[in-house]
Amino acid sequence: MAFPEPKPRAPELPRKQLKTLDCGQGAVRAVRFNVDGNYCLTCGSDKTLKLWNPLRGTLLRTYSGHGYEVLDAAGSFDNSHLCSGGGDKTVVLWDVATGQVVRKFRGHAGKVNTVQFNEEATVILSGSIDSSVRCWDCRSRKPEPVQTLDEARDGISSVKVSDHEILAGSVDGRVRRYDLRMGQVTSDYVGSPITCTCFSRDGQCTLISSLDSTLRLLDKDTGELLGEYVGHKNQKYKLDCCLSERDTHVVSCSEDGKVFFWDLVEGSLALALPVGSNVVQSLAYHPADPCLLTAMGGSIQYWREETYEAEGGAG
C-alpha cells in the first residue's frame, strides 16, 4: 500500500505585527512596496513622498516637490526612479538616489489618483478624477502625453499594467482593459463605483473592489465572475485590494479598521486582521513573501507570518 502524499504546506498569512512606523507626513494616503519588496514608499497629505526600509524602520529619503497631497506612487523595475501623482494634478518622475525631480508632467484637469510604470519604466500611466488615463514618455522632452485613454465616464480610481495590457477602474462602475497589441478595449460592468483593480499574479484573472463592500474575481479574457468576497466595509473611500504572493488569498482594506483575507477558491473568510480603530487607508503585499504593509492615519504597520524570525534581530 502507498502512503498518502504529504499535503503541501498551507500558505501562511501575515498576522504578526513587527513594526509600526510614524511617518511624520500627515495622513498616509498610500503605501507601496518597491519591486523586490525590500523598501517601501509612503505618500503623505503633507505633499511629501518618503522611502523607507520597513523592517528596520529607517527613513532613507524624503522627496519634496508636489504642490498638494501625494495620492499614489510607484517604483521602477531597476529601483532607479519613482513616479508619483497627487492633488496638484501633476505626475512627477523622481531620481531615487538624488531625490531630485527629473520631470513634471502636467495635463490632467483634476487630481491624480493612481500612477504606474510600464514594465520597462519608459512610460508612466496616470489615472485622474478627470476621467482619463494618460501615458507619459519618460524619455521625451515633449510636454503632452503620448496617449490619452478617455473612454471612462467618471473618475479613474485605479490603473494597473501587465505586459501589453492596461487595467483601468472607474467610478462609472466599469473596469476597462486595453490590449495595446491588438488596439482593443474590453469593458466589464460592475455597477458600483470601482475603488481598486489588480491582475492576479498568474495574469489569468482580475480582482475588482467597489463601493458596495464587495470584491469580485473575474476571468480576464471572458469577464466571467469567478468569485465574490464580502464581510469587509467599503462604502465611502478609495481602498486597496490585492492578491497574496501565491494567489491563494484575496486581501482588502476595510473602513472598520481591519484587513480581510479570503480563501480565493472557497470564498470563505480566512482572517480579519485588526489594525486599529480607523479606516485602513492603504495596503501593499510583498511580491514573494507573506508580508503586508498597512496604512492607518499617519503611520504604517509591518506584518509577517507567525513563524517569521528576523535575521540579526532586526524585528
Curated annotation (Swiss-Prot):
The keyword Metal-binding does not apply. GO terms for cellular component: catalytic step 2 spliceosome; cytoplasm; lysosome; nucleus; spliceosomal complex. One of its GO terms (biological process) is response to hypoxia. WD repeats lie at residues 23-62, 65-104, 107-146, 151-188, 190-228, 231-272, 275-313. It is found in: Cytoplasm; Lysosome; Nucleus. Pfam families: WD40. The keyword Repeat applies. It comes from the Eukaryota. Highly expressed in testis and brain. Expressed at intermediate level in heart, liver and kidney. Weakly expressed in spleen and lung and absent in muscle. Its main location: cytoplasm. InterPro entries: G-protein_beta_WD-40_rep (IPR020472), WD40/YVTN_repeat-like_dom_sf (IPR015943), WD40_repeat_CS (IPR019775), WD40_repeat_dom_sf (IPR036322), WD40_rpt (IPR001680), WD_repeat_MORG1 (IPR051980). Keywords: Cytoplasm, Lysosome, mRNA processing, mRNA splicing, Nucleus, Repeat, Spliceosome, WD repeat. PROSITE patterns: WD_REPEATS_1, WD_REPEATS_2, WD_REPEATS_REGION. Interacts with EGLN3/PHD3. Interacts with ERK signaling proteins MAP2K1/MEK1, MAP2K2/MEK2, LAMTOR3, ARAF/Raf-1, MAPK1/ERK2 and MAPK3/ERK1. Identified in the spliceosome C complex. Interacts with PARD6B and CRB3. Interacts strongly with GTP-bound RRAGA but not with inactive GDP-bound. Interacts with p62/SQSTM1. Belongs to the WD repeat MORG1 family. Molecular scaffold protein for various multimeric protein complexes. Acts as a module in the assembly of a multicomponent scaffold for the ERK pathway, linking ERK responses to specific agonists. At low concentrations it enhances ERK activation, whereas high concentrations lead to the inhibition of ERK activation. Also involved in response to hypoxia by acting as a negative regulator of HIF1A/HIF-1-alpha via its interaction with EGLN3/PHD3. May promote degradation of HIF1A. May act by recruiting signaling complexes to a specific upstream activator. May also be involved in pre-mRNA splicing. This is WD repeat domain-containing protein 83. It comes from Rattus norvegicus. The gene is Wdr83.
